[in-house]
Every structure is written in structure tokens, then in C-alpha cells.
């Protein structure tokens, strides 16, 4: 067969992009180069750019197209739609030239013969010669047709693929990116179908799509064919896998988030383009579990690493699990085109919203920006034209056809979709904040309503009422002076960890476990340990919350492990000091099922908390769960940069008892390099510092409690709040005692209280006293670093 017009995938390399487009060249590259390394890619063939150009030259088609486009204004959406439709119909009506027709038939017959004469089904996909250039994400600009069989249906699908180079979004996109229409050609790829209609499929990236953090693989997954994930028609499951521990052969799944997965795309019994697939509802039982196993997540992540290493750059990869043979296949791989382009930009832009906020709805945050404007509710594509510059576009889900109007919006909000859908990809590329998968945003938001859309607060994006006060700060990270002390960060929210990873720091000086328990678990540990004793209503609520996990107790341990592992991975191999849960009894009582198990205390700030709680008969089994989670993170997952901090240790007896309890739960001081840090936050800790240090490897000073207990004031009381000041001479005496005791014994001493974040002069005094590290809120890291360098590097 002449390979003028048709080439088999295995004969293609990345050097053939101009002949068969990025998508098909990449399939050929993987089949020929990565099959031996264990990456499975279904085979097939591609038509060439020459074939496409020969087709357009046939019957004077290209002249008619050029004439129609020459006078088109793409900002006129109605005219764009009319001209695009006319051109596409011309293409569908034009038969293939004789040679192309013959080569397609010969290739198809060979494909059928190679399959043993079976009635095979294929995917017919477009691959534009400019589609996957790193500076132009043509994501989903052209069509894909799934479950096509029979030669006539394959040829019809190829006609549709060729026509898709002139759909509205593709025409608009080329103008937007400065491509001439006739320099982009199209290749049709014909690939054996993976039966993910009865399995699962999704997308993965070899970096975090929102922060650009490149030490993770981000995997999305849902039931059925992958188009729903790509189009944003479902909210998929999401997983993060940590590359360094994956390479080391350790369990490396950092985090799992269950998506709603309401529908799945399956095959129909029709085999022609446009009729070969349909969506059906997913049974509730399947929705309430993860669509792929931990073993499959890990296997996919290994494929992602292999592909990324081969291409030498971050990648965006589509995959499918065949429901018949149970195997995982890679369907596409292309360069990631947004975050990896920002590598040279070492400026950090942070958004903060000031004042009171009323949440109208929430979903998955795309990007890390904030947008504001009036709501523009759009039911379908026919209303697109009503979107004006600065509107907040609110709709059920966007179609890639909407790209021409998406760039007018100040923000985008959708009911459906996950972080790898088209709306998300285009929003990222345009630099517009988007909140996807809100569920019912189109019902909760009203046309013309003024809103603020925030993607600056972690994985969850919020739509707030009104045009709120937004503060923007820009920081250049390139020219940071040497810090005169170790600067660390206080981080509680694992969802923000990757965003903070590019801040200059020595690690996390305070990782608050209670944030994980409160936000990501929300249930009292005793209610989970005694699940069988709960009433039916509480059982139902707990069962709903723990969907996807093996048991109530497993849920608690797994969620703590996920949160801590994410925090530790974000700064690995730098230290992460994890404080064991420091809830007070009233805070524990607020958790689901908690009011039954907690005492009522007049002053919980000074009550049943810290070390005394951990060793108490009515809580030590709960503490054991926290220990089990941290042991897993350190010993199984290999994140040995995790250190343990014990808060609120009142007496030397408590210190001895809690160290013993940790050892009994597998967390022995010194074993596998484990350091135990004590929070030095009571006057007794400072006065008896040398004795307390017998049990610990150092102190982290909690200046908040140390101040209130030294000065005898309730920090939660507004009546005496004016007297609260960490810089009070009495407090400084206590801190001096603690720091000097650590220095004398050559043990670690840091501070993780609020004081240094609020008062740079206090941070300076601490450094002069000999403190080893100051742990700051992330938003004050740069400012305090620069202040200390300026004051102390003289």
C-alpha cells in the first residue's frame, strides 16, 4: 500500500506531526516506543495531511471555503454559525478522491482480517496538524466518533472528522491564535475501540492542573466512555498520586475525592456517526463507590510517568479500562499546554477577598483567580450571543463550541463537569476563573445578579453574593535574599498545599490535623468506632459520608492519612511537623455524633484537650486511629519527612504517658528517624523546659496559648483582648527560658503561633534569641522573610 494517504500507527513518530497531526503522531510514538515498557495503546491507522489537502482540492472545495471565510467576522456569532454550517455541509457532500477511498478500504480490510475477521468497532478521531502544539490547546476542537463499524460508516465518520476543522469553535480559535485557516490540515485516526462502555475511563495529567505542582499525577475517572469526562457532562472521581514514592515502589495515592458520576456513555446497536453511543443513568450503588481501584490508579500513574519521561515534558493523557478484558489502555497523550507554559514566570499572584461573604453555591475550582460581574444564565448554545464582556457565564455545561463567547466572560460557572473537562481546559487557557460541577447553579443564581466567583481558596470554588472587595498581591520570587532563620509555613488545608509548594520555605512548621478532621471527615471518631450503637438516623448520615471506604474506622484513618500525606508531599523532602488533633471538647461536640461523647465544660480552652485527652480511657482508642494514620504515612507511604507534635502537655507525667502511648501505637521516638516535638505553650513548659525535653526532640512554641496563660486572659474574650500581646515582657521571659533550654541541649526550637505572622518585630526578636525556625501563615511568608533579611543580614 502506498503510504501517501494512509499510514499505520506503528509506522508513525512524533516527527510526523505535520503529516498526521499531534494526536495520531503521538499514538504512533507510544505504540512504537513504549509498548515494550508496558504501555498499552490500541492500534489502527491514520490518513495524512496530504490526503486531506487532496480531498479539499477535489471538486474545487478549497476555493469555495477560502472565499466564504475571507469576509467572515468571527465576533459575529450568528454569521460564524451560518458560514461554518455551510462549509461543513459542502465537505460532507463531497466524495473522497479515488486513491484515498481505495487506501481507506484496504486499511480497513486489513484491520478486520488482523482481528480474525471479527465485527470490530473503532473510534474515528480527528488530529489537527496544529492541535497539540504546546502553545495552542485545541482541546476538543475537532470531533471524535466512537463505536463505529463497517467500512461505509467509517468513511462517513471520516467525512464528519474532516468537516469538524470548520466547526465554529475551530474557526474562531484559529483566528484567536493567529493561525491561517489553510495551514492547518486534518488527519483522521481509526483506532480499535477499548470497551470502556462497560468499564471506566478518564483523563490524567502529570502535574496538578491548578497550581502546576509537578510532583504529582492527577487522575480523573468515571464509568463508561471517556467523552463525558472530557466534555464535562459528569463530575468524575479524582485522585492524586505522588511521583517520588511511586517511583520508590511505595503506596503513593495521596488523595481520593468521589465524584457524583450520574451518567455513563455506552454503545448502542447502531454503528454510524452520531447514533453509535448514548448516555444512561449510573445505579446509585455504583455512584457511591470509586470507579477504579487503588491498584488501577497506581498502574495508570506508572503509565503517566513512563509517558512523561519519554516525552520529557508534562502530559495530558486519556485512558480507558476495557470492561471485557479488564485491562487499562492509553487512548491519547498530548503535551499539557497551560501550567507548563508558566514555568519561566516566577511571579506569584495571590487573591484575597475581604469582608463578610455569603455563599450562593460552590463546586470545583478551576485556576486560582477571582472574577466578578453580573450573572448571565445561558440555557443552550442558541443564547450564547447574549453574553457580554465581563459577564459571569452560568450554564449547565459548556460545549467546546462556546469558546468564542467564553473569552468574554469574567468567570464561568457550570452545574456539571470536573477539573479535566473542556470548560476547565479552555478557562485555564484563557486565564478565566471557573467553578464547575456546582450541581444546581442555574437554579440558585439569578440573571443580572452581581456575584464574586472565587477560585482562590483551594479545591472548592465559591460563588458569593455581591461585588466583594478583592485584594491582589504580586510577589517576585526570583530575587529573594538569604533568610537569617529557617522560614516554614502553617498549613491546615490539604487542598491548598500544592498552591503553597512554590513559596520559598523550609517546609511546614505546623500542619493542623483538626482542619482535616473538621473539613474532610466531619464525624466524631467515637461515633465511627461505635457505629453499631448509633441510631438509624445517625447511621444513615455516617453511611452517606463514608461512601467509597471499607468501613467507618477505615474512613477516619484513610482521610487523616490522605490529608497528612498531601501536606507532606507538597514540601517533600522538607519537614512537615504534624500536630495531633487539638480540638477542645466543644469543638469535638460539633462533629457529627459528637455531642453524645463530649462533656460540657465552662472553659473548654483550659479543659479536656491535648496530651491529657490522648491518654484518657475514654479517648485513647480515638488517639490510636490518629497514630495508625501517621504510621501509614511514614512507614508504608515512605513520607518520613513527617514529624509528630504533641500539644498542651501540662505535666511531666503527661509527657511520659503520651510518649509511651505513641510507642504502643507504633510511633516510637527515633525509630525510622521519627522526631517527636512538643508544643511549648504553657508556662509550666517553659519553667520546666529542661525536664520536658527529656521526652522530646525539641519544642515548637505556641505563642497564642503561652500568651493567654502567662497573662491570665481568655483570648476568645473581646473584653480583655486589648491586653493580648505576645511581645509582653512576661511572655518574652517564658520564651527566653524555652529557647535557651533547647539551645543548651542542642534540640530543635521553632515557633508556630500567630505572633511572628502579625508582628515582624517579634519575629526579629525571636531570631536574635536563637530560635531555629519561624513558621508563618503562607500569606506573610514573603513579607516576613524580606523584613528579617533586611533587618538581620546587615
From Swiss-Prot:
GO molecular function: ATP binding; metal ion binding; pyruvate, water dikinase activity
Cofactor(s) listed: Mg(2+)
Pathway info: Carbohydrate biosynthesis; gluconeogenesis
Catalytic activity annotation: pyruvate + ATP + H2O = phosphoenolpyruvate + AMP + phosphate + 2 H(+)
This protein's record includes keyword ATP-binding: yes
Binding-site list for substrate: 512, 579, 681, 702-705
Binding residues for Mg(2+): 681, 705
Xref: InterPro entries: ATP_grasp_subdomain_1, PEP-util_enz_mobile_dom, PEP_synth, PEP_util_AS, PEP_util_C, PEP_util_CS, Phosphohistidine_dom_sf, PPDK_AMP/ATP-bd
Group of enzyme by EC: transferase
Protein name: Phosphoenolpyruvate synthase
